[in-house]
């Protein structure tokens, strides 16, 4: 297998608090890898370190061998590590299609402001970006809401739009931040299918943080488990379900069920 992303002995300290402590793992190209752990385990902090929204105290993160930690987040995104957010990248006054078109600015010759101000370079890109947006809409099954304002969308459609925005940037590794949060069972299973299709049909490597353990166990090739900022386990879903350290970490927590 080809390694696409490496997390090497990454540590993050906030004053006297160590939020992430000497965490290492690799993500193989074309893999779906989940990061789980009880509340406060350091999952969100780790995601921010990988996407460079936080700087590492020590250690490094590498994309295809190139060190990317502590670069500006937009540079990391341009290199191919793209993080989806829980609505913060969505322009609520724009339609679904317009949001996807605007998100192409990460790989455009024009700036984002160029799209708003109508620069010549932006106009030259507009047609191809429109076609790409339509392809993404078709791929994710968003045709029925393509012209709906983002502000009117229910939770499941907002999650799908967030995924579409990430996909529009042509990522090598897509970081999904709680993609199943707030969804019912049917919506979750639909999103699980979409994530699999991203990998199988688009060749996107997926790294996700999620609390929905049944969904994690269903979708993941491998799982990394954090507790108190440290990696305590790594393996297949079956190996994680039967790992005594993982079971002990979850016992007595709000996340006690680990999806067996």
Question: What do the PLM-derived regions correspond to, one by one?
Answer:
Residues 1-260:
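Glycine-rich phosphate-binding loops of nucleotide-dependent enzymes
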């Amino acid at each position: 297998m080809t390694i696409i992303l490496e997390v090497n002995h990454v540590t993050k300290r906030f004053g006297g608090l160590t939020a992430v402590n000497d965490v290492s793992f690799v993500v193989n190209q074309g893999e779906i890898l989940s990061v789980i752990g009880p509340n406060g385990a350091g999952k969100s902090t780790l995601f921010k370190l990988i996407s460079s929204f936080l700087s590492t105290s020590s250690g490094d993160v590498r994309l295809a061998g190139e060190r990317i930690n502590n670069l500006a987040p937009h540079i990391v995104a341009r290199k191919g590590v793209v993080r989806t957010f829980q609505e913060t990248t969505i322009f609520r006054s724009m339609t679904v299609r317009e949001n996807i078109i605007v998100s192409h600015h990460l790989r455009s010759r024009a700036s984002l402001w160029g799209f708003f101000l109508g620069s010549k370079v932006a106009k030259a890109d507009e047609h191809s970006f429109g076609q790409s947006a339509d392809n993404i809409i078709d791929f994710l099954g968003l045709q029925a809401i393509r012209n709906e304002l983002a502000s009117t969308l229910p939770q499941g459609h907002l999650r799908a739009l967030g995924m579409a925005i990430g996909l529009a940037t042509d990522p090598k590794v897509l970081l999904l931040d709680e993609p199943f949060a707030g969804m019912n069972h049917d919506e979750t299973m639909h999103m699980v299918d979409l994530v699999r299709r991203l990998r199988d049909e688009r060749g996107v490597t997926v790294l996700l943080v999620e609390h929905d353990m049944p969904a994690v166990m269903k979708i993941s090739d491998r799982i990394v488990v954090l507790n108190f900022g440290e990696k305590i386990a790594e393996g297949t879903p079956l190996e994680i379900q039967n790992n005594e350290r993982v079971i002990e970490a979850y016992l007595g927590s709000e996340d006690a069920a680990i999806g067996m």
